[in-house]
A protein has these predicted regions:
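Signature for HUH/AEP ssDNA processing cores
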Residues: 2-130, 137-149, 153
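Long, charge-rich alpha-helical interaction segments
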Residues: 41, 191-198
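Metal-dependent nucleotidyl/phosphoryl-transfer cores and adjacent nucleic-acid-binding surfaces
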Residues: 94, 186, 193-195
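Short, glycine-/Ser/Thr-/acidic-enriched flexible segments
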Residues: 99, 181, 192-194
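Short, conserved secondary-structure transition motifs
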Residues: 126-127, 140-142, 163-189
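Conserved His + Asp/Glu catalytic blocks
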Residues: 157-161
Length: 198
C-alpha cells in the first residue's frame, strides 16, 4: 500500500477492494496485511480548505473534497462495487456518526468488543460533532448475509443508535482518511485477536 506496515502482534492477511474515487467503475481487489491497512489509515491526506470553509460548503462540494479514494472491506467480482458483486468480506466497517454528548465510542469498543480494531475520524469530524469509522478484522471471510448480521450485532454491542443505518451494506465503501488543513484527525488502534465470527 506504499507505506511500511505497522508492527502488530496480531497481524495477518486480508482482502480489500480499492479505487481512487467513489465513482470508480473499476475496483481492484488487493491482498494486504492488517498492519499495512493500519499504516494507511494512520496517515490521512490533508486538504487545502479550512474546517470552517468545509462546514459552509454544499453537500456536493463536501463529497468531492472528501473523496480521496477508498476501500471496501472485502473482495468484489468483476471490479464493480454493487451489492451483487460482493464475494466475501474480511473486515467489518461501521459508520459512527451519532455520538451522544460526552461519550467516547473508543472506550466502548475497547471495553465491549476487546478484539483488534481501528477507529479513525472522517473529513467531517470535529471534537464537538464526532464522525468516526470503526474497522474490525475477521477470523475468516464472511458472506454478505453473514456480514449484515455480524455488523448489526457489533453495532448493537457498542450502541446501534450511534451507527448509520446504511453501514450494514456489504458493498459499502470507506473513504481513505483525510481532514481539512486545520482539522483534527483521530486514529486509535487496539492490537488484539481478530474477531472470531464463529
Amino acid at each position: 500500500m506504499g507505506l511500511p506496515a505497522m508492527k502488530l502482534q496480531y497481524d495477518g492477511p486480508l482482502t480489500i477492494a480499492t479505487a481512487g474515487s467513489r465513482k470508480s467503475v473499476s475496483w481492484k481487489n488487493q491482498d494486504v496485511s492488517w498492519g499495512e491497512l493500519a499504516a494507511r489509515l494512520a496517515t490521512p491526506l490533508k486538504t487545502a480548505e479550512t474546517q470552517d470553509e468545509y462546514n459552509t460548503m454544499r453537500k456536493a462540494q463536501k463529497d468531492e473534497i472528501k473523496d480521496v479514494g477508498g476501500f471496501v472491506g472485502g473482495a468484489l467480482r468483476n471490479g464493480r462495487r454493487k451489492a451483487e458483486s460482493i464475494i466475501h468480506r474480511s473486515l467489518v466497517t461501521l459508520d459512527i456518526d451519532s455520538v451522544p454528548q460526552g461519550e467516547d465510542p473508543w472506550e466502548v469498543v475497547t471495553l465491549v468488543i476487546g478484539c483488534a480494531a481501528i477507529l479513525y475520524s472522517t473529513h467531517s469530524h470535529s471534537p464537538k460533532a464526532p464522525r468516526l469509522r470503526l474497522v474490525i478484522p475477521l477470523s475468516r471471510k464472511v458472506t454478505p448475509d453473514e456480514y449484515a448480521a455480524l455488523s448489526r450485532r457489533i453495532a448493537g454491542d457498542i450502541g446501534i443508535d450511534m451507527c448509520d443505518d446504511t453501514t450494514y451494506e456489504a458493498h459499502r465503501l470507506m473513504y481513505w482518511p483525510s481532514h481539512s488543513i486545520d482539522g483534527e484527525y483521530r486514529f486509535e488502534i487496539q492490537d488484539g485477536l481478530w474477531l472470531d465470527v464463529d
